[in-house]
Amino acid sequence: GKSSGKGGRNAGGVEHNWNEDIPVLARSMVLAKDTIFLAGPPDNTDEEDTFQRIIDRDKTVDAELAEQDAALQGKHGGILLAVDKNTGKQLSSITLQELPTWDGMAAANGKIFITTEKGKVICLE
């Protein structure tokens, strides 16, 4: 069946507390108390709209796809996003100079540690 909204069921029969689009393609994620931290390249593309434009042979979509590819390659750095675990609302975000590695984030003692594709470790407080 269709999702019945907040707290509804999706086709898999799983209860959802919330469902939010976020402006990052999460490569790393960690929960610290009531905050979910996600890090990755920016997500500049609305996939459903883009797919329809490709079907419609809209040539203007090529530039957007090239921009998203550049983001995936790390040309725009990354984003660290903080999200409330209870509501899904974005709390804050910062720009990272480099892309995080896959699953390369940890939280401990009030700090976030992120490893980057260029071999650095970043500590944020």
List each model region and its residues:
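Extracytoplasmic/lumenal domain signature
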Residues: 1-125
